[in-house]
From Swiss-Prot:
Location relative to the cell: Cytoplasm, Nucleoid
GO CC annotation, single: nucleoid
Family: Belongs to the MraZ family.
Domain (SpoVT-AbrB): residue spans on this chain: 5-51, 80-123
GO molecular function, one term: DNA-binding transcription factor activity
UniProt entry keywords in alphabetical sequence: Cytoplasm, DNA-binding, Repeat, Transcription, Transcription regulation
GO terms classed as biological process: negative regulation of DNA-templated transcription initiation
Annotated Pfam families: MraZ
This protein's encoding gene: mraZ
Highest taxon of source: Bacteria
Protein name per the record: Transcriptional regulator MraZ
Principal location: cytoplasm
Cited SUPFAM superfamilies: AbrB/MazE/MraZ-like
Listed InterPro entries: MraZ (IPR003444), MraZ_C (IPR035644), MraZ_dom (IPR020603), MraZ_N (IPR035642), MraZ_sf (IPR038619), SpoVT-AbrB_dom (IPR007159), SpoVT-AbrB_sf (IPR037914)
């Protein structure tokens, strides 16, 4: 289970060092085989391969005649990239994916349960600012009655 956020730096080759606290779990659960893809929020999603496979299968099962579904399939599946974590716990983020998410040197890796989100640090700060400005009427019905 991945949770919490960590400020990291991409190296000059676009490699991201996965925090040590997650490396053993990733090597044990997927042998370091990871899928990185685009998210509509202009961040990147990072999945262990076994977690990604049913998601990709589900996305492919939707009717592709719907323009909205086809567009989402193109974005998520069309940008999916298989990467392997090296012995130092690094993964290479491709140039097209870095460009899509606007990633600069300083990034934030945010645990989201079974996956991570990778954000440019400035965009992450804006996202968090937005998340803290909800008014009572802005809460989606799915979250009504939910308490932390």
């Amino acid at each position: 289970m991945f949770r919490g956020s960590t400020q990291l730096s991409l190296d000059s080759k676009g490699r991201l060092a996965i925090p040590a606290k997650y490396r053993d779990e990733l090597f044990a659960s997927c042998g370091g085989n990871i899928v990185v893809t685009a998210d509509p929020s202009r961040c990147l999603l990072i999945y262990p391969q076994p977690v990604w496979e049913p998601i990709e299968k589900k996305l492919n099962s939707f009717p592709s005649l719907s323009p909205q579904i086809r567009s989402l399939q193109r974005l998520i599946i069309g940008n999916a990239s298989d990467v392997e974590m090296d012995s130092s716990g690094r993964i290479l983020i491709s140039a097209p994916l870095r460009q899509f998410a606007g990633l600069q040197k300083e990034v934030v890796l945010a645990g989201q349960g079974e996956k991570f989100e990778l954000w440019d640090m400035a965009k992450w700060d804006l996202e968090i600012d937005t998340a803290t400005t909800y008014k009572d009427g802005d809460i989606p019905p799915e979250l009504e009655g939910f308490s932390l």
